[in-house]
Amino acid sequence: MLLIESFYEGVRAATDQLELDFGYRTKSRLRAKLASGDEVGLFLPRGTILRGGQKLQARDGRVVEVVAAPEDLLEVRCADPLELARAAYHLGNRHVAVELGDGWLRIQADHVLEGMLIGLGAEVLPLRAPFEPEAGAYAHGHQHPGDGSGARIHMMGGQ
């Protein structure tokens, strides 16, 4: 089994891919299969959240790219920004992982939350797409200098 214990920060292209949904990308210890079919064991620092496009360094020198797998999501749209902010508030109040976009929110599919959002007047559409939610104010994710993931107001914790 291929072992991965660190991130790759160089310029070499990845030689394989590791496709994982968001739930698996939050696990620091994981056994999975690469696109090539090779088994891989992840032993990353606790609290790591993998993002699509990140590169990992295997013990044997191989570079593996993380791919955010498509999953069942709900896209939330509202008639105006205040209603969208209200929907985001209620999701945040329930500690729901939320991906933010221009005029929309995305969450993992959940019929209870879907009902709540419809009750708030939101338009809720099911879709299948990669899920890249906000890290949260207290997250301790891994970032790369120069990749556009530098500290921002919504990434205040321990960067």
Curated annotation (Swiss-Prot):
Family matches, as Pfam families: UreE_C, UreE_N
GO biological process: protein folding; protein-containing complex assembly; urea metabolic process
Stored Gene3D superfamilies: Urease metallochaperone UreE, N-terminal domain (2.60.260.20), UreE, C-terminal domain (3.30.70.790)
KW Chloroplast (keyword) present: no
Keywords carried by this UniProt record: Chaperone, Cytoplasm, Nickel, Nickel insertion
UniProt GO MF annotations: nickel cation binding; unfolded protein binding
Chief place where the protein resides: cytoplasm
Recorded family membership: Belongs to the UreE family.
Function in brief: Involved in urease metallocenter assembly. Binds nickel. Probably functions as a nickel donor during metallocenter assembly.
HAMAP family hit by this protein: UreE
Name of protein: Urease accessory protein UreE
UniProt organism field: Azoarcus sp. (strain BH72)
